[in-house]
Each structure stands twice: as structure tokens, then as C-alpha cells.
């Protein structure tokens, strides 16, 4: 293990970050081995540093939905907070740095698994989690120490990382300085200055060659340029010190992490090195190249999975009622996993060759497992041929697929289903009134004489509840065409708590639903999906969510042009692929505003 004072100094680096001067100096950028704590943590839990609390903390608070889609091309971009690498980005960056060293990621795995999970305290996208807590600091230090120790434990590993010259009996200064420059360029995602190389080189003072290399590896892995998206080296726009065009290396890094969640590859780095990335044609070619890579599609699919909460599932109930309800359905974790994979396949297919409306209206079958195909009443899709269609009139788009409909027990909850559409698909807040009476949020009890719709409607028929529920509950009632496993039905089974099947009753999915564009009469889920596909508010909501996912924060004044560009491409004639690529092509992507 490296010395305790060295580790404490590293922790101080993470807790405070200045913005000027040489590394290691008071008020410096914190990237050197002697950096000290330049600031105190933000209010919050003990040990939280800058970035603790909600994403964008310190920026003016405003209603996020007040930011319009009216683009003024000459307007400044919005102010963006300093962001650390997400845990996914951090792992992929480590993997790229130590690709030549066998077992490096395995050596780091224990410490990596102790890092806080992004999004564990965030209601929206995981990547909007900007916290730096004591757990993060401890984790980063432990990862750096484990990886550095792993490299130094075998001369062959050090040779793979730094060259054979690193294993001489004494320190080869030229070899050492070259390693600092080469490894630092990758870890910091830009070339190091001469001053930085000299300051890292001071780690060789008073120690043997092995400890010098180990110290550099450790120090660079806990430096802010490694752990944060630092953008400090741009050029002033029209003489304005607060508005910067990103430097070529900053732009390369922003683009790569945006599309790949990973650091720039060799080709992208080369365009930054020679400055050609600043050319519009070269930049657009690199955007296209990165977007054509499977890693970009993975990033897009992950967006929809998080937006639609696909990864949130606590397992199926083990009650007698559920056992009766699920007879013959193979209701297990494998069924849910297959349903989640179907969503990924549907999204990937229509991102490549479709538009946003297709995600609401598609009746194509992407069920690859036999159990899920049986639930839909179709043959499994083979994963390569053109997908066939689901039974006519039963399903349309994402909202009607099993992963969006499966509940943990035998019943459905129209309130939850409807609130999701209102809140997440139409971007209209669903706020419970103050002073709710006891039991207000508890589902109504089973009634052998009533359907789920009748029971839930009776619960909120009082004037206190009816007005609010009228805005979102009809969406959930239209989805009563599907049971708690996502099976299409025209009749609802009435099952008591002991698992006795008492009979069945017709399902009513006719609703009068309130959209921002006006009231609509809908006969069921297919018409609901079609109405959402045609809703301008739903299109705007998609643009807002994809902005938040991409920029890791809520939109602010100055983001109107990015939002407008996204919205422009989600209409009936638009391309979902172009919409998702638009963020990188917007002029604001190349600039940073300081306040």
C-alpha cells in the first residue's frame, strides 16, 4: 500500500477543485501529486463534497417545464455544472487505460463494486447523479491503489504499460518522463503541459524506480482530470472570457462520452491532436463514425430503458392468488428478463429505421423467448429475420409490451399506470394534494362483485380526489386490456386472497382522456398509443428527457435550441436516429459558458 499521508492528500484533491495555476499549487487545478483541499464540501451528508445534493446544485432554480422550444440561434448556451465521470464511464475509462495489462480490471473489481450506484438517490436518469461523497472518495482511492499495486506486482505488466525500459535496475529518466506524458495524455484525455510533466516527475524523488511508477499511476488515477469532465482549455468567443469554444481535446472527450460513455479512441484523439476536429466536415464525420458504432446504439437503448423504468422489478409474489392467476404462464425472472430484452430489441430496430411515432404504434413482434411469445400468442422471433406482427388490434408500441405492464402480484393498478403516462410521457407533474387522509394511497380491497376499474373509480369518486385523478386515471383504465402479467384480455378473472377463482367479468377500456391538446374518446390501449404518438406534448416530453439523459441535468434557459432541434426530428417525417444524433451536432455542443 502507498503511504497514508499520500492517500490523505489524494482524498483532499477530490474534495476541492480550483480552476487556475499549475498542478500542485494552492488554487491550482488539483491534478498534481501535491494538490491540497481548495474548498469545503457542499451541505449534505457527512463527507459530501462539491456536487453533493441534487444535480445542478448552485444554479438558479426554475420550473424546468418553463424552458421553451423557441430557438434563438445567437443566444448563449446554458451554464453547465462540473460533472464527474459516471460509474459506467469511469469503469470504461479504466478499461481503456489498462487494456494492455492483463487482470487489471479484475484487480480493481472489489473496490469498483463498493462505489455508490449512480441514481440510487435520483428520481430521474442515473447519470444525473452528480454526488461526490466519502464513499466515492474511498472507492476512487482504493481502485487506484489496487490497480497500481497490480501493475507493479509483475514486471511484465509494467512493461506492457510503460515499455521494457521501465524495468531497469535504476530509474531511466527519459523512459519515466515519456511514461508520464503518454499515460497522462490518456488519463487526463489531453496532452500534459511541461509543468505538469515536471510536477508528476517529482514523485521519483527519494524513492526507487518501482515506487516512482506506482506513485504516478496512483496519482493520475485520483486526479480531477481523470475523474471529472474538466473543460478549462477553450478559446474565448468574441473576446468574452466567460464563453469558450471547447478545445479539440475537450470536444473529442465530450463527443466520445456522449455517444460511447467511454474515452476517445485513437482515431478521435488523432483529429484532436492535429486540430482537424474543429473543422465542421471532420467533426460531422466523426459524429457519424461514433454513432455508427454499436456502443452508440447501446447508449440510446439504455436511455429508453431508464426512461421507461425497465430495470425496476422486485420479482413476482408467492401468494395463493398469484399462483392461481399465473397458472400456465411461466411467471419467473426469466420471463421478465425476456420482456425487458424485447423492449431493447424494439427500440434498437426503430432507432435504426423509424421515428418516435413507431415506438408508440409498432405491432412488430420482438419476443425471442418461448414463454413471452406464448404470452403474446405468437411464434418466437428468431432475432435475425424481419419481425412478424402481433395479433391484430391487441398491441401498439412500447406501452403495450409486457415489460411495461407486469406487476408483482395478480392485480393491476390503473392509478400507477396512468400516472406514469401523465408524468413521464406527457411531462405533466402528478402531485398528490396536501393532507391526504389515511389510506389514500392504499389500493382498494378486493371485491368479488366489482372489476378493478370499478373498485379504483369508487375510491376516488369524492370531489377531493376526482379532479386530479381525472387527468391521469383514464390512461390507466385504457390499459386494463392487459392483466398483471401483460396478457391481453377482454375479461378479468376475479381471484380472492386464498387463490379461489370466483368467476370473470368483462373489461371496460372505453375512456375520455385529457390531453394537453384537448379531450379524446379512446376505445382502449391501441387508440391511446396512437393519441400519444400524435401528441405534440409527448414529442416535447421526449426531447426534454433525451436532453436530460445526454447532458445529465434538467434543461435551463439557453438550452432552447438543443430542445428545438430534437423536437424538429421526432415528427411523422422525422428520423429517430437523426433526433438522437442532433445533440452532438448542435452548435451549443461545442461551447461552454462560465458564470
Question: What are the functions of these language-model segments?
Answer:
Residues 80-83:
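GGW-centered surface loops in extracellular recognition modules
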Residues 59-75, 87, 95-548, 559-595:
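Active-site substrate-binding loop specific to GH73 endo-beta-N-acetylglucosaminidase modules
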Residues 1-2, 7-70:
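Ser/Thr-rich, Pro/Gly/Ala-heavy low-complexity intrinsically disordered linkers and tails
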Residues 551-554:
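Axial heme c-ligation environment in periplasmic c-type cytochrome domains
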